[in-house]
Structures are given as structure tokens and as C-alpha cells.
Amino acid sequence: MAFPERFSNLPEYAFPRLRALLDHHPAGGVPVAMTIGEPRHEMPPFLAEVLNANIAGFAKYPSNEGIPALLAAIQGWIARRYDVALGQEQIMVLNGTREGLYNAAVALCPERKAGAAPVVLMPNPFYQAYAVGALALGVQAEYVPARRDTGYLPQYGQLPPEMLDRVAIAYLCSPANPQGAVADAAYWRDLIALAERHDFQIFADECYSEIYRDTPPPGVLQIAREMGAHPERVLSFHSLSKRSNLPGLRSGFVAGGPESIRRIRQLRAYAGAPLPEPLQLVEAA
């Protein structure tokens, strides 16, 4: 039987490899948890009441569009956090951001760019969902170093112009995991200007946006609005896993241009599953 080769070089997922390394630690001493980065605080206590009150919702199929109460809650949060007003057609509820980061590439990456195979940019180190989306599409994944000498963020603008013309998507995680670097407003402006010049989309993985000490980090939506960028230029991905101590809920959202959101939603209607309504009500709360 023939099997595809496009995932042949995909390594085992990071967490099983990490478990294999940590399972053989020597006896004695105080163990330090270095496995998956789960929150160490309790989930908000009122959420159990919301879930229990709406448990009957598991008996029906959820809407692919998302319930109005949740879409309105996301609208309100984006307006308060980033001073950006979005319509509900610019928001999509996700089963965690990993779903969205992968599906967005599948739904939005063109077959050709500048007469050649498209390029998908991502920082190195990177979240595996970025790479597997590029591999699934058969496009060129370009891993751009995010080291001390680059400020722990990828310097996409230093790539050759002929490569940048082929770029369809550039992923960026800010605040970055695992480096902890934060893209400031100047970095976002430079990246958005680069995307405008070479006509590619920015997928901003902002799952850690609410983890900071003093000043909230700027977001791609607010900088794109200030610059008057093309409405489809950026997508912003968010999650409740870290900010609300709810990694098991698998709940997040993506926000951006209405045509991009329509295409991602259309793909999931065929190849995915929306978040169950009781869990959407928990997220809205």
C-alpha cells in the first residue's frame, strides 16, 4: 500500500519526546516539572456553575458560526484590549488555537505565488502546528532564526527580496514561546509594512498576550488598524488555555479579515468540528 511522503520527515511531536527524556531521571531530589506548560492555578470557580447550568447543550450539534453571546463577548474583549472594533463576521470560535493555526494555512495559502511554490515563514524555535500546515500543503517552509543576536524574534525583512515575493504566510508568536520575547509596536509596524510590500498574510499567534508584568504587549490588530493595512493582511489567534487556566477547554478564537474568516469557517464545515455550545457559554462567561 502506498502512503504519502509529505510527512515522512515530521519528527515525533515535542511532548512525547520530552516525556521520554524526563522519564529516566535519577531517584531522589525534588522533581521540577518540565513537561507540558500547563497553568498552575485553579480555573475561575464560577465557570463550573455555567457549565452545569447548560449541560443539556451537549445533546445537540453546535453551530459552526459560534453562538451570538460568545461572538459578542469576543468583540467586547478585542475592543477593550486593543481599541479595535470588529464585526462578528471577522471572528471565528476555535477548538483551541492549534486548530486555527493549521486550518488557516490550509484554507488561505495559494497554490502559486510569484510564479513558484509559495513560502511559509516561521520563527525557529517554532510551534509544530506552523510547520505541519506547510508540509500538508507541500509548500516551502522557511525557518528563520530567533536568537539572541536577533532579539529572540525572527528578522523576516533580512530575507532575499526574491524569496519575500514568494511568501504567502508569515507566522509570528508574541509574546514568544519559548523565548519570552515581545514584538513591540515598531516590530509589528515593520512586519506589516513588509507584508504590504510583498503581499503576504501575517498569522499572529498571540496566545500569551495576557502574560506580562507591567505593560500589555501591543497586538497585531491594533497596529494594522493604525497603519491602515489591507483588511485581510493579518489574523490574530487567541486562547483561553493560558490566560484563564483552561487548557482542557480547548477554546480560542481567530480574528481578522472577513474573507479570510469565511474561508477558514468553510473549511471547518467540511473537515472539523465546532466547539460544543456549553463550552462556548463557558468561554463567553
Language-model features: locations:
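PLP-dependent aminotransferase class I/II
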Residues: 233-285
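Conserved core of the PLP fold type I
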Residues: 59-193, 210-211, 215-228, 235
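N-terminal small-domain helix-loop-helix segment of the aminotransferase-like
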Residues: 4-103
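Walker B catalytic acidic pair
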Residues: 206
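Glycine-rich "substrate-gating" loop/helix at the edge of Rossmann-like oxidoreductase active sites
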Residues: 4-9, 179-181, 241-242, 269-272
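Helix C-cap/helix->beta junction micro-motif
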Residues: 25-28, 137, 197-198
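Residue-level marker for buried hydrophobic side chains located in beta-strands
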Residues: 202-203
